[in-house]
């Protein structure tokens, strides 16, 4: 029986309170003393603060663990969703690159860490623009995502490998007031998954409210450095939490159903896979799978629809093979052919020559004076590549694959969530995330 991969992940974020840094130290040392490496996802501003506060003890403790990124400024407005919810993708993307490059610089300067394997967005900041930016920055994994399956299979979306957060210790009352029975029941639930992330916010072991709920809810409530401290928990609650955290770690280590791992180990395993290549001998199998369903393929390799689109273009133009790379979906909703049409092989080849070789995909395509959708074009292209001289297409075909396996992305609606500002409208983010479904693959 395949073991469940279990990751211990820590949203290490409170840059407003030196007291909260004590919790980072405690949780890091609990794991180290049990022989387990955690993944501490650090906010860039907190990395600076740990240096400013002289917290060498915390920085030394973190060196045992994997260090990753939890954005530059977490909840400081405008947060990632607020500044990327604009029509101009290039402007949104560039600002993510600017801020998150600075975050990594701060994290590395403070901790001395090497490669960053995962980016964890704060709260509900699920921005397609950030996902593309992280991929292009060389960060291979995006965690606390809405683009994982309910079973924890993982998968690529916007060119990053997506892993869902599953069990948050500080969000479960039993970690503060319960004990072994509740912990064993939680492990039973996690063991049903292929992969599970157990996570904490270290500051919440000492405080009863999140630091950003008192300082950054909707607005930046105070000048930087003049923050409120969140209400503290009774000491006995904190102690019970730490006892239960240690117990959870021990029981997970002893449980043969689990294999404890890190984001880095998963990323290295994924990176070791051979290049994904669409070969001429694959075209008939691809055509048959696309006839069955407009959906990413798992054979002959892991291919997203954007991979297949670029490969079809290349093969129509005479290529023998196409090596897949980072791809993109759509900036606007793709539009189907409005009525049935017949396309010739020569028209398809001419249209391929006019298509861009990279970047976002076109929402509509002209083929011999007929306007069709990208899915219409994709299916017709593979028919031609398999020998057809003419291809009939239907009108009104669905242009996007089903997101039922990624139901959180399918149902995403970000307006009014988390600490977003009153002016945040979600004019683009939720829809554009769904329009990137052509980059989904497993």
Cite the ranges covered by each PLM segment.
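Loop/turn elements at helix/coil->beta-strand transitions in domains of secreted/extracellular proteins
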Residues: 2-5, 34-39, 63-66, 113-116, ...
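Metal-dependent polysaccharide deacetylase catalytic core of the NodB/CE4 family, i.e.
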Residues: 37-129, 150-153, 197-200, 265-272, ...
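Active-site-adjacent pocket scaffolds in enzyme catalytic domains
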Residues: 48-52, 76, 117-221
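Catalytic grooves of carbohydrate-active enzymes
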Residues: 5-23, 29-31, 165-272
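N-terminal catalytic cores of secreted or lumenal carbohydrate-active enzymes
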Residues: 25-43
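Trp/Gly-enriched beta-strand/coil motifs that build multi-repeat beta-propeller-like domains
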Residues: 286-442
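Alpha-helical scaffolding segments of alpha/beta enzyme cores, especially the outer helices
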Residues: 26-29, 56-57, 102-106, 129-136, ...
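Catalytic domains of carbohydrate-active enzymes that cleave complex glycans
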Residues: 34, 126, 142-144, 148-149, ...
